[in-house]
Structures are given as C-alpha cells and as structure tokens.
Amino acid sequence: MQIGKEMAIPSILKIGNGALGKIGGYLKAENLDQVVLFFGNGLIDMFGELVMNSLKETEVNVLEYNELDTVDIDDIITLAFAIPNKAKAVISIGGGKVIDAGKYAAFLRNLPFISVPTSSSSDGFSSASASLLVQGKRTSVPARLAYGIIVDTQVIRTAPEKFIYSGIGDMISKITALYDWIFEEKAGCGEVNDFAVMIAKKAVNSFVRTPYESIKDELFLKELLDSLAMSGIANEIAGSSAPTSGSEHLISHALDKILEVPQLHGIQVGIATYIMAKVQDHRYIRVSTVLQDTGFWDYVATLHMKRSDFLKAIDMAPSIKPHRHTYLHEEKYREAAKKLVLEDEVLSRVLED
C-alpha cells in the first residue's frame, strides 16, 4: 500500500511589513551564513544597503552579489557553476526574471533558494518551475520550491500599482483553473489531487473575501501574498501547475505569442479569467466583483488591448498545451468564449476594436 508522497514546503515563510530589513536574522536562524545574492536590474541601489546591513549585523557572509537581467538558460548555467562551493544558499531579490534565474541556478547546484520578490505580479515567486529562454523560446523548466520566501509588504506597496493588479489577476485565476482541472478529470484526461484542490481553493477564497478600502492596505497585500505563496504549494502537492493554471493561462500564453509587447502576465490572465468564469458558468459574479472593486478594469482600459487579439488567442489556446483538456480544448466552449469577447458589456468597455 502506498502511504503517500513526500513534498517540499518552505522552511522560511515571512510576509509582512519590514521583512526585508530582517533577512539576516531569518537566514542565520537556518544556519545559512554563506550566501550568494542576485538582485534585479537597478535594485542594488534601492535595497542593497538595507539587505547588506541586515546580513552584516547577523554575521551572514555575502560571498558575491550581482545584478541580473537575463533568463537565458545558457547564461544561468554558466552563472550557477560559478557559485562558490562554500555557498549555503542562493538569494534572489527582485521581479520574475531574477527570481527564475536564481531559482534555476540554485536547483542546478542543489542549494536552498530564498525567494525575495519586490512585486506581487504573479505566483512565480513560490512556484517550483522557472520560465527561461531555451534556444530563444520562453520555456517552463523544472526547478524546486523555494526553501524560503521573504516578502516585505512595504516594498510591495511602493511598487507601481500595475504589479498589484497583475497579482490580483493571477490570484483569481485559481477559480477557473481548478474548475478546468475537475472538468479534465471528468473527461478522463487527468487525475485531481483533492488536497491540492483544497489548498488552492482556500488560498483564493481567503483572498477574495478580504475586506479592504485600498489595494495598498496592509491586510489586503498580506492576504494577496499569502495566497500566492499557497498556490505554489498546491502545485507542489499536485506535481503539476494544474491547480493554478487552466484555460485562462492558455489564453495568456497565446497572447504572449501574438502580441509584439505582451502585458504583464497577471493582467492578461485576469481578463482571461473573467472570460472563462462566464464560459464555465462558475463564480463569475465573484470574479467580476473583485476585478471591478479593486480598479483592475479601470487599469486595463488604459492599455488599449484589442478584441481581435483575444479572439486569436482563444483559438490558439489548445495548441499551447495539447496534452491538457480544459474547457477551451472543446470547440463549443471556444465559440462561447469568442462570443463573449464580442458581446460582453465589460469587455466592450476595456478592449478596443
């Protein structure tokens, strides 16, 4: 009889105001006192002194630190094997690029990875995969769930609002992704892990029920970040991204191929979640309320996104992951989604012809 499976969870999980200035103490408590630091482009000037002072005060030795602006897998392999042998951890501070680069470098060297996101734009900071350029093509490659996640809500608050909107879009996508996963199992094309469903569902429900006056409220940001972190754990349990990535993500990935300059991942995903929630006839009022009340739609209306691009993306979606069987893998639901793009009142307001 199979007892169960082993899974990794973060040993360090610190999300709150001022967390970045306490990073040294968090690392020292785990005996991670020899580290390599990677900062996102321009972030040494913004956060370098705060981080270095915290590490120095707690006698955590920085073996080397650099700014990174690449997700090319060849660059990262070279970087990984230049990490000193006595390093005990790799730390990435910044956005998606440097998080993915550091995560993969740590994976190659079998070192603990500490994820320190400076924006809330997606759940990538907590995921066990990295989005890298492989022979010029954006590719999701396996890595490992972060050993530590440290997020300073004050840092998140001072980032441009578009990153918060992106995080909101990525978070609510769990509503449609979970429904796709269950739909897939019913079609005989996959197997749902009930515990992963529970974790992902609890994450999104905790977020969408949070009271707030502003999207920069401490409680709102903490709930958003907590929930994004839980999403990564749901994927780890499932052994895939199915609990958090469904038809709405396929639309976004298709838009990445169609658009010369794609929008932030979570912005595209948020719009696609609204479309798919209506197609699925599943919790679309909740999705609509969150997007309206947070100001997400007002932001989207400034982006001049085109209806025609979404129509193309819906048709392209099944080819992005042909092994899946989401709602969009069936023609009748693709047609329903396209009809919605053409006729829905909200989409008519925020998308252009």
Language-model features: where?
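ATP/NTP phosphate-donor binding region
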Residues: 1-89
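Solvent-exposed alpha-helices and their adjacent loops that cap or buttress functional pockets
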Residues: 5-7, 30, 82-85, 106, ...
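Short glycine/serine/threonine-rich phosphate/pyrophosphate-binding segments
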Residues: 44-47, 97-103, 122-125, 244, ...
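A short, small-residue-rich loop immediately preceding and capping a beta-strand
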Residues: 83-105, 109-120
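A glycine/threonine-rich phosphate-anchoring loop and its flanking beta-alpha core
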Residues: 108-203
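Active-site segments that bind and position negatively charged phosphate/pyrophosphate groups
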Residues: 194-301, 305
